[in-house]
Design a protein with these regions (language model features):
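Predominantly extracellular/secreted Zn2+-dependent metalloproteases
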Residues: 1-166, 176-223
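Walker B catalytic acidic pair
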Residues: 172
Length: 223
C-alpha cells in the first residue's frame, strides 16, 4: 500500500502516509446492504471445508468403493448447502424447534441430548471433508469426524428435500457430531422430522434459496 488519498468508511477523503498504510495495522471489513451478504455475515460457524475424492476419479467417473470423484458442480452445491445450514443455525425459530425435541433426542447411551447446546455444538465443529457418495452399492451417505459425504441427489435436491435427501444430509451431520445408530441423532427425529423439515419449510429465507440459482440439475457434468 502506498501514500495517497483514500475514502474512509464515513465518506471523507483523507491522505495517509505510507507508514500509516502498513498492512500490519490494517484490518479488512466488508460493508454491503445486499440481502445475501446480510444473511451470510450472520453465520457464526467457522467450518474449514475441503473437497476430497477418496479415490474416486472425477474425469472418468470411475468410483472407488463407496466414493465417486466429486466434481465442481457438486462443490458449488455443497457451498450453497453449508451456507444455508450455517445461516439456519443462527435463527431463533430453529433453536425453538430443536428445543421441542428435548427428551426425544437420545445419545449413544440412550440418555437425553441437551438440545440447548446442540446447535452451538454443530456450529463449533472444525469443518468437513466433503465427498460424493457412489450410490451403486446401496449407500446414500457416510459421515463421522470430519468426513461427510452424500449421494448426488442430496446435492441437487436439498432445496425441496426430494425423496428425503435432506434426511441423509442431517443423518451424516449427526455422525459428525459423534452419534452412532444407537442414538436418535442419525436414524431418528433429528434427521427425519426436525432439521430436515425445518430446512425444507424455511428454504425461501436462506441465502441460497432455489435450485434455479446454480442450475446444477441441468449441468452436463453431473453423473
Amino acid at each position: 500500500l502506498e501514500k495517497g488519498l483514500y475514502r474512509t468508511e464515513s465518506g471523507k477523503v483523507l491522505q495517509f502516509s505510507a507508514e500509516e498504510m502498513n498492512p500490519a495495522s490494517l484490518s479488512l471489513k466488508i460493508a454491503c446492504n445486499d440481502p445475501y451478504w446480510t444473511k451470510i455475515s450472520q453465520i457464526k460457524a467457522k467450518w474449514y471445508i475441503k473437497f476430497v475424492l477418496n479415490g474416486g476419479n472425477p474425469v472418468t467417473g470411475t468410483p472407488n468403493k463407496n466414493w465417486w470423484g466429486i466434481r465442481p458442480v457438486h462443490c458449488r452445491e455443497a457451498v450453497a448447502l453449508f451456507l444455508n445450514i450455517g445461516y439456519m443455525c443462527t435463527l431463533e425459530k430453529f433453536q425453538q424447534r430443536v428445543s421441542t425435541f428435548q427428551g426425544t433426542f437420545l445419545d449413544n447411551n440412550r440418555y437425553p441430548v441437551d438440545t440447548s447446546t446442540l446447535i452451538s455444538r454443530l456450529e463449533n465443529l472444525s469443518g468437513f471433508d466433503i465427498g460424493l457418495i457412489y450410490s451403486g452399492n446401496g449407500v446414500s451417505g457416510l459421515g463421522g469426524g470430519r468426513t461427510w459425504g452424500v449421494y448426488q441427489k442430496s446435492f441437487l435436491y436439498h432445496y425441496e428435500n426430494s425423496g428425503g435427501c435432506c434426511s441423509t444430509i442431517f443423518h451424516e451431520l449427526g455422525h459428525c457430531l459423534g452419534y452412532n445408530h444407537n442414538s436418535t441423532m442419525t436414524y431418528g427425529q433429528w434427521a427425519s422430522g426436525c432439521a430436515d423439515v425445518f430446512y425444507k419449510n424455511n428454504i425461501k429465507d436462506f441465502p441460497v434459496n432455489s435450485h434455479t440459482i446454480l442450475k446444477s440439475r441441468s449441468n452436463p457434468n453431473i453423473y
